[in-house]
């Protein structure tokens, strides 16, 4: 079974491609996490977990969900992580997670996809994003070939910098940067509730037709990047930046 969590669609796209290539069922963790559903999941022997990279590891919300949820029938697990640039030493923590689940760790693969973390970085314009997705195809094909053969992924790079970013920096990043305080709606907001619908942690509610953010945020960027009116800002960090979600790339270029 292919499990995935996504913020703005990159991981969903990769997970769908992998599930199609392996003829495996696809399981949406966003829906489970949003519903607080930790009932056992009948996965079968092989599990492929596809996630974005948050602070140089898999998202904390995903590792927490896995810690509470039995993967019935699972014996082996592969991790596929998409990122804007690098995953650090995420593989070391994925190995630990597999051991905690008493699963055979089959490796971690990195696939570069368009950046979406506009709370800190710049997202690409649409044409550049399309180019990045095209450039990701060889890596995706390698991952598919290795999965079809039941092979372990080759170990990713691991140096002192990687260990530092995934190690000490990760909890500091969550503590000081992963907050919803800076999100706000502009006058362009039409109160459609798209942000409320997409938030995997139920951290957004509408008050007087405008979104209000709570304290439980994972910085997935779904609210700000999917807003149809681009009416959400993250303090001054997001002003003037392109909003990125994968589905926009699938629309006609003149749309």
Language model: regions and residue ranges:
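FMN-binding flavodoxin-like domain, especially the glycine-rich phosphate-binding loop
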Residues: 1-2, 6-14, 20-32, 37, ...
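Short low-complexity, flexible loop/linker segments enriched in glycine and/or proline
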Residues: 41-42, 121-123, 220-222, 248-252
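Conserved short-loop catalytic and cofactor-binding motifs
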Residues: 50, 82, 128, 186-187, ...
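Generic structural "secondary-structure junction" signal
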Residues: 56, 113, 208, 234, ...
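A mid-sequence, solvent-exposed acidic-amphipathic segment
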Residues: 159-191, 197
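Iron-sulfur cluster-binding cysteine motifs and their immediate structural context
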Residues: 184-185, 190-212, 216-218, 222-239
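Long, positively charged, glycine-interspersed low-complexity recognition regions
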Residues: 230-255
């Amino acid at each position: 079974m292919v499990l995935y969590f996504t913020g703005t669609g990159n991981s969903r796209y990769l997970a769908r491609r992998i599930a199609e290539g392996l003829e495996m069922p696809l399981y949406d963790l966003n829906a489970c996490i949003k519903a607080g559903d930790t009932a056992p999941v009948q996965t079968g022997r092989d599990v492929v977990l596809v996630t974005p990279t948050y602070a140089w590891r898999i998202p904390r919300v995903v590792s927490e969900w896995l810690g509470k949820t039995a993967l019935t029938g699972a014996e082996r697990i592969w991790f596929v992580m998409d990122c804007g640039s690098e995953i650090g030493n995420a593989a070391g923590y994925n190995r630990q997670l597999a051991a905690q689940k008493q699963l055979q760790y089959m490796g971690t693969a990195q696939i570069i996809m368009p950046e979406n973390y506009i709370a800190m970085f710049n997202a690409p314009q649409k044409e550049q994003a399309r180019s990045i997705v095209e450039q990701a195809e060889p890596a995706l094909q390698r991952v598919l070939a290795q999965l079809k053969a039941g092979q372990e992924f080759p170990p990713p790079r691991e140096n002192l910098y990687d260990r530092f970013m995934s190690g000490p920096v990760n909890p500091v990043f969550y503590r000081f940067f992963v907050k919803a305080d800076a999100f706000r709606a502009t006058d362009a907001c039409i109160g459609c509730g798209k942000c409320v619908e997409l938030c995997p942690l139920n951290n957004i509610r509408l008050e007087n037709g405008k979104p209000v953010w709570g304290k439980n945020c994972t910085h997935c960027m779904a609210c700000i990047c999917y807003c149809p009116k681009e009416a959400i800002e993250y303090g001054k960090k997001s002003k003037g930046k392109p909003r990125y979600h994968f589905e926009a790339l699938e629309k006609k270029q003149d749309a």
